[in-house]
């Protein structure tokens, strides 16, 4: 808008790993509060404000019957990251003058995303590491589908002051994920290695302590362990489908093919530079 408030703002700033809760709180909550207060103070509040939260804000789900996470799930975040996200959500809920929409995406993947890249690299080396022995249901959303959902939600007149889970509307097992990635990489032999929970916890604890010494946040930490330990990430996107016609154009197979294509191109470019 040339004068007054913005038409729309997508607030995607956030930290997914940090040295401590203080950093998570500062980046994920305080920055949001400061930003919205500045908008209000300068009379620049947008007509719609889309906040990118996370499925982790809801915490652990039903791991007995594997009931999908949905809009009725009561949040009880079990990670520092999830706690900082639900705190931000609660802040928005208590400020109706902010015309908020909240997205709770599941694991976002795509070219150049770092966490899933580590899993792809392992499978490229013929190994697939998993945590725990009980069945685990995983959900994913390809980055292009998430971006499309943002603009569809902003264009809808039904989304104001609503929260939406964003995911491809089906879950996968670790075995299915491994098979899809291996096929995209052209790897016929991949050895699955299951780490017991205690071993994964020890590795996460050591990596986190080292990050405190090096002052560099580690991808592997106790927060990440709790996420890896969680067995049920299955979720419902019924509200998003009903309110703004959400659909995923990239099922995991297609999204992984695009992600692997970018990974192999970067790998070839790095090899050519040596």
Predicted regions and their residues:
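Mid/C-terminal beta-alpha module of Rossmann-like enzyme folds, strongest
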Residues: 156-219, 253, 257-258, 267-274
């Amino acid at each position: 808008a040339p004068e007054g408030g913005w038409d729309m703002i997508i607030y995607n700033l956030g930290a997914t790993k940090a040295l401590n809760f203080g950093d998570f709180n500062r980046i994920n909550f305080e920055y949001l509060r400061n930003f919205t207060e500045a908008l209000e103070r300068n009379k620049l509040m947008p007509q719609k404000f889309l906040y990118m939260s996370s499925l982790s804000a809801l915490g652990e789900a039903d791991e007995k019957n594997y009931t999908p996470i949905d809009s009725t799930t009561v949040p009880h975040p079990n990670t520092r990251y999830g706690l900082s996200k639900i705190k931000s959500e609660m802040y928005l809920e208590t400020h109706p003058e902010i015309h908020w929409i909240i997205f709770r995406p599941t694991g976002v993947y795509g070219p150049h995303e770092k966490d899933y890249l580590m899993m792809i690299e392992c499978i490229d080396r013929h190994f697939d590491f998993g945590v725990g022995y009980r069945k685990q249901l995983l959900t994913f959303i390809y980055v292009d589908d998430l971006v499309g959902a943002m603009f569809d939600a902003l264009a809808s007149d039904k989304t104001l002051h609503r929260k939406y889970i964003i995911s491809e509307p089906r879950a996968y097992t670790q075995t299915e994920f491994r098979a899809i990635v291996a096929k995209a990489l052209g790897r016929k032999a991949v050895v699955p290695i299951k780490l017991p929970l205690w071993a994964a916890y020890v590795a996460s604890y050591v990596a986190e302590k080292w990050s405190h010494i090096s002052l560099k946040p580690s991808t592997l930490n106790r927060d990440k362990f709790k996420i890896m330990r969680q067995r049920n990430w299955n979720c419902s996107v019924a509200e998003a489908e009903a309110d703004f016609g959400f659909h995923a154009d990239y099922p995991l197979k297609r999204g992984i093919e695009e992600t692997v294509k970018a990974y192999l191109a970067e790998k070839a470019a790095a090899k050519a530079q040596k």
